[in-house]
Amino acid sequence: MRRLCVYVLIFALALAAFSEASWKPCSQLQDAPSGPGANKGLYPHWPDQLDRLGPASHHRRQLGLQGSPHLVADLSKKQGPWLEKEEAAYGWMDFGRRSAEEGDQSP
């Protein structure tokens, strides 16, 4: 029982340490840089590299300016045509189930 309490305490401390950055506002984080140029070091010259790629990179440039949270949200909203194909491909399974149920009901 004592070991369980120690493990729970260690787990709670680790959880608190790892989640500390997620619940604090950016202004309270001590290690986080602040100011208008604070995030320049994350992706230095990235839009410049896209400009050199040519006109095919126009869509990539728009996605890069949008930011990754918006990109993930946009991608999660999209559904591809494969869902419709899968539903059409497995439609026969429903027919097989219904015909088996009808066969069980006959005397």
UniProtKB/Swiss-Prot annotation:
Residue numbers of Pyrrolidone carboxylic acid PTMs: Q62, Q79
Residues carrying Phosphoserine: S99
Main location: secreted
Stated name of the protein: Gastrin
Localisation per UniProt entry: Secreted
A matching Pfam family: Gastrin
InterPro entries assigned to the protein according to its UniProt record, in alphabetical order: GAST, Gastrin/CCK, Gastrin/cholecystokinin_CS
Signal sequence extent: 1-21
Residues the record lists as Phenylalanine amide modifications: F95
GO molecular function: hormone activity
